[in-house]
Amino acid sequence: NFPVHAIMMEKCDNTLDSLMCGKNELTEPEWAATLLQVIMALIAYQHMFAFTHNDLHTNNIMFVKTDKVFLHYLHKGTYYRVPTHGRIMKIIDFGRAIYKYRGKTMVSDSFDRAGDAATQYNCEPYLNPKKPRLDPNPSFDLCRLACSLFDYFVEDIRDAAEYSATLKESRVARMV
């Protein structure tokens, strides 16, 4: 006998990557709605589970098509009505996630000394007391996502200055 883990997932239509690389680029309102859906999901996960995804990029965000026009969120006493533009975004691939459940912190073995993410954090259960403590940070997920989006919007880092005026005007860029 050995333990078996089974991961089930809703069948999704495609990834955010597919929308970015498709024929029709996302409009600014579609980008804003997409990012707000992802941010609201992260807020809920972080609040309920002290959650950090640790690998949030555009291929780990999928969507299902919907006829719902809006999604409604309540956060810190404020209601948000976010248009769907026909898509509900889903965060996937929790293989590197760190979260708390029933008082216990769940950590992937990717963060073990032999794992491919060994030096990202220094905390239990893989704490090295000889090094400074470095706990998971919920802001990491949006930073990681922003890096993958930056890579999409800016082809060559040497040309980033050309985008600076455009980025200052873009509501989506200011969100990222």
Regions found by a protein language model. Name each.
Residues N1-P29, Y101-V107:
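Conserved structural core of kinase catalytic domains
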Residues F2-M9, G86-I91, P138-L145:
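Extended HEAT/HEAT-like alpha-solenoid repeat tracts in very large eukaryotic scaffold/adaptor proteins
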Residues P3, E25-A32, L36, M48, ...:
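Short, solvent-exposed segments of well-ordered alpha helices
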Residues K11, T15, E30-A33, Q37-M40, ...:
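Acidic, Ser/Thr-rich intrinsically disordered and amphipathic helical segments
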Residues L19, F49-T58, F63, K68, ...:
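Short, flexible/disordered secondary-structure transition segments
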Residues N24-H53, T58, D67-K68:
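Conserved kinase catalytic-core helix
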Residues N54-P138:
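Catalytic activation segment of kinase domains across protein kinase-like and atypical kinase folds
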Residues Y121-V176:
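Helical subdomain adjoining the active site within ATP-dependent kinase catalytic cores
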